[in-house]
């Protein structure tokens, strides 16, 4: 498996949308399997991020298109310009890796937003 040591990204979030993540920048890792593009790359955050679909300790992400729906027509442009921005715009609390974040997202959005902003300030 080839390993690319990280990419500094600032997802292209529509500034007209009110995403709590729009001010953050994260270092991510991408691992390409030998079967790429027929098998999806593994994508994870190296920078801490408080998100229902990211394991807070490992940075592993739960994103259906990378785990189940990947096809060879997708590439890194899709990941950076579509999948990750949508992932940050629309957290899915129904399929969490971070249960604490998912519960706050569903039950106390103000506290959830505060935790996101604290992590952005601390780590980004």
Show the residue positions of the predicted features.
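N-terminal onset of structured domains
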Residues: 1-26
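Eukaryotic intrinsically disordered and solvent-exposed regulatory patches
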Residues: 13-16, 29-30, 48-50
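Domain-scale recognition of soluble eukaryotic interaction modules
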Residues: 6, 10, 39-124
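Proline-anchored loop/turn motifs at beta-strand termini and strand-loop-strand connectors
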Residues: 29-41
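Short glycine/serine/proline-enriched coil/turn segments at secondary-structure junctions
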Residues: 18-22, 35-37, 53
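Hydrophobic/aromatic-rich, well-ordered segments within soluble, folded domains that form packed cores
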Residues: 21-29, 83, 87
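A generic structural motif
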Residues: 16-17, 34, 67-72
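Glutamate identity and glutamate-enriched acidic tracts
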Residues: 2, 25, 31, 103, ...
């Amino acid at each position: 498996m080839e390993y690319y040591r990280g990419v500094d990204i600032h997802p292209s979030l529509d500034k007209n949308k009110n995403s709590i993540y729009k001010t953050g920048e994260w270092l991510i890792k991408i691992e390409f399997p030998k079967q790429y593009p027929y098998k999806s790359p593994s994508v994870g955050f190296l920078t801490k991020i408080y998100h229902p679909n990211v394991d807070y300790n490992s940075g592993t992400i739960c994103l259906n298109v990378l785990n189940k729906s990947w096809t060879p027509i997708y590439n890194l442009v899709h990941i950076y310009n579509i999948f990750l921005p949508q992932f940050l715009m629309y957290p899915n609390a129904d399929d969490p890796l971070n249960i604490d974040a998912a519960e706050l997202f569903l039950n106390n959005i103000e506290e959830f937003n505060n935790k996101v902003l604290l992590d952005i300030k601390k780590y980004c």
